[in-house]
């Protein structure tokens, strides 16, 4: 029985080849949590468990297919050092699909939350990484230029942690200037939602741009900023397969 348990444990935490290649390509440390995990940052604690082997293999393929769309220079510009993959990831006890730990230059991603929807998990890869970009740029939550694009009567909520209800991330054309209910929760979430859906739901976003001048202006500002932040995120990127 002991031998069997050890064998199962080894299989449970084996690093999928696709994640190994991500680490090599982007010069980042990629880890899979292999025991109950806890890390405390400035005012918050992240906890996670070991993912099941089948969940890990499935997620690793999805994650790698999305991450490989980024130019190597973009990951360096974001100052990302580590990617940690786990299950049941929580931030101060609140379950999360992913968490950016800014002071640790680390991204955490959950293999199982939302795994009923591949498009959702794909979008999360980009949404949460964008927070890292925004933080490096110094405009995560205070962004007067972005806020000025909204209608005068528009007001954001008190943050994404306050909006965790099912369906908050569903695309809708019922909200002028934003893509989802979740985007209304905070300026940082508005930007991240737009970036994530540009990469995963490009046709939908372009359709909204034609009918909503605020969204069109936000896309223009977002792309312009990204091009200045990293020269590889340019028109050629957005017109390539990687950007679509």
Task: Annotate the PLM regions.
Residues 42-103:
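Auxiliary, metal-adjacent structural segments of Zn-dependent hydrolase domains
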């Amino acid at each position: 029985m002991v031998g069997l348990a050890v064998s199962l444990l080894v299989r449970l935490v084996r690093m999928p080849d696709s994640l190994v290649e991500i680490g090599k390509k982007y010069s980042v440390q990629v880890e899979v949590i292999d025991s109950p995990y806890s890390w405390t940052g400035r005012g918050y604690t992240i906890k996670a468990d070991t993912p099941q082997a089948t969940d890990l293999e499935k997620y690793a393929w999805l994650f790698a297919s999305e991450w490989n769309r980024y130019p190597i220079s973009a990951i360096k510009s974001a100052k990302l050092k580590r990617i940690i993959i786990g299950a049941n990831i929580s931030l101060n006890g609140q379950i999360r699909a992913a968490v950016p730990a800014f002071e640790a230059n680390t991204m955490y991603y959950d293999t199982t939350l939302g795994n009923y929807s591949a498009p959702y998990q794909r979008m999360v890869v980009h949404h949460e990484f964008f927070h890292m970009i925004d933080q490096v740029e110094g405009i995560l939550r205070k962004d007067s230029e972005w806020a000025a694009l909204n209608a005068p009567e528009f007001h954001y909520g008190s943050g994404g942690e306050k909006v965790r209800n099912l369906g908050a991330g569903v695309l809708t054309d019922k909200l002028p200037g934003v893509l989802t209910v979740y985007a209304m929760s905070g300026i940082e979430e508005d930007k991240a939602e737009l970036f994530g859906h540009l990469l995963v739901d490009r046709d939908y976003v372009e359709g909204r741009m034609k009918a909503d001048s605020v969204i069109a202006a936000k896309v223009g500002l977002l792309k312009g900023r990204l091009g200045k932040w990293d020269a590889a995120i340019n028109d050629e990127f957005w017109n390539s397969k990687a950007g679509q």
